[in-house]
Amino acid sequence: MREITPPLPAGDLIDSPRLMLRDGTVASVRASTPADRDAIRRFFHDLSPESLRNRFFTSSQPSASVIDRMSDSTDPAQALTLIVHRLLSDDLRPVAIASYMAVNSRVAEVAFAVGDVFQRRGVSTALLERLAVSASRQGFQRFQASTFADNHAMLEVFRDSGFEIRSKTDAGVVELQLSLTMSPEGVRSSEERDRIASAASLAPMLTPSAVAVIGVSRESAGLGRRVFDALRAGGFKGPIYPVNPLAADIDGVPCLPSARELPPGTDLAVIAVPAPLVLAAVDDCAAAGVKSLVVISAGFAEAGDTGRALQHTLVERVRNHGMRMVGPNCMGVLNATANVRMNASFSPVVPAPGRVSLLSQSGALGIAIIELARERQVGLSTFVSVGNKADVSGNDLLQYWERDPDTDVILLYLESFGNPRRFARLARRIARSKPIVAVKAGRTTAGVRAAGSHTAALAASDVAVNALFQQSGVIRADTIDEMFDIAACLESQPLPAGARVAIVTNAGGPGILAVDACVAAGLQMADFSPATTARLQAFLPPEANIGNPVDMIASAGPDEYRRTVEAVLTADEVDALIVIYTPVDRRTSAETHAAIAQGIGAGRRAGSVGKPVLSCVIAEPGARAPMLVDYPSAFDPDLVVHERVPSYGFPENAARALGRVTAYAAWRAQPPALYWTFDDLRVDEARDLCRAVVDARGGTWLTGEETRRVLNAFGLPLLPTVLARTADDAAALASMFG
């Protein structure tokens, strides 16, 4: 057994045609073909003499044989050339070319050339990582490279790459040897570069300086008009430009006849025109320098083969222009933070600002989710309806939210995974600092079919999804409502240090329900110490149950609630508290609520600031609104803490939410897993078998024999196993084993 380096981010993206640049723009990347000869020749012809010299050690153009070799990537065991393309003056051209060519079976020579305008954008670094992953898969162990000693930019790429490097300088030329195994520090640097580029690409979309809406009609019911009206009503801080060639103005705001006339600095354009007109709108936006798009229009991959082909063309066009796109077939994006206040969607509801960010793959559900957030008083930071996820996906948004100062909790409504391996790697890292709560729809066969027709989603096995979430630290919620139950706890309460929970109630029935739900959720009922028991006995009536749950009985008034909550919250043997209140006399409800808040505040002042508190108010209007608790800080008496205690309509909801949060806290407390391997594993054999099963039968269970072969490939010892098809067969076979 030996520890190995975790995989490079480029390994998750090796087949992706999108290349992220450091400045937040994107480009297309693919392996060369013989049809690229003329484009490659033209690329080198347009390079400056200095760039040619740095690539070929001469300012002369490369020979035809060199061009031919770069144009042939049919056998990556011999050579591979990656070409980066962008649309320049409506012409798709190479802007960077990187190659490796075999020296022998273990060593390949690597070289790069980047167009002068695209240098210093991280292109060479990204291409080096992709080439390294591809070369490793072909059995290469090292790259070798040569560069002039004064080519500081290229030397910086190699030295900052994270690969182990040996170098020597002779006559002004540096000869380098790069191991294709990256150090853990190098992997972390690579992940950070990937995160920075992804976040930079989404900043113009989520924090734009100005927004255009393409397809704003005079009719108030049109989607473009609804987005335009929502932007104005939401209080967006920057200019809003409606685009309509047939209208002079919309509600007094002058219209532009074409997106090509948008002024500089228009970061985001929302496109709401019929699907056949979207490509032209994209080209117009690119000509005006727009950096990001939200395509609300439907009629793409969710609409059949013709729409799927149109979506493929759309994504290529957007990528070749260097832009990012949400959608198509989405409801828009929203940023509720005070300094942005952008509702670039057709949601009629603007949520209160908060610290929860949300992704929804369904537009219609997105509207309901925003309304539920308002009802539950869970404030949102950003909301993105990704629709068909043709470009921007949940993985991109996770990296944006990872360091977003306005996001503490991440919520996901998913119908599919585009790249589950990448999701697992990102979620495992991000969940260490910010909780991720997900609802994954399509749990049944019928649900999978519905998801596919709804947003062109490719659903995954529910068993696989559970395993993915558990390993990645993602909190899975079964319903949207449960997702908000969990979010309400996470956004306002500390993570528990353990699973010991105490329950305070004034009615036995709800207390019993709470106990059952807590145990089912994996929580432990705290055993009160003699000190805690004595403290409760000092003021509670003899009829009260001093155990856990603490049943103060129906006659308990505000004072009993205040003192009991404080006593239990400050008990060392308690990690979390659920307070249940069943209004027996509504005339004292307000006073009792205040007393519970006072008890929580007293417990906080006494030092119990690290314990989550959840409340449950039964059969009372507004029961799910958070309880507001104000108290002087335990660290600074002049500072008043304003705490929101989540409230639930039934004890089971509170218990389930606390159980999910406690399990997440336990996962987060564990040290990050190390990557281990064994030299005698036959991973390729197991992988090939599983792929053959998927190709033959789709996502399904392995047979007994297939399972045995997979486990055997991983060196796991198996007991003798036989298959019984009837109860009598099982009894007969069991007798054979004693």
Regions found by a protein language model. Name each.
Residues 2-204:
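Long, contiguous binding/interaction regions
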Residues 183-738:
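Catalytic-core regions of core metabolic enzymes
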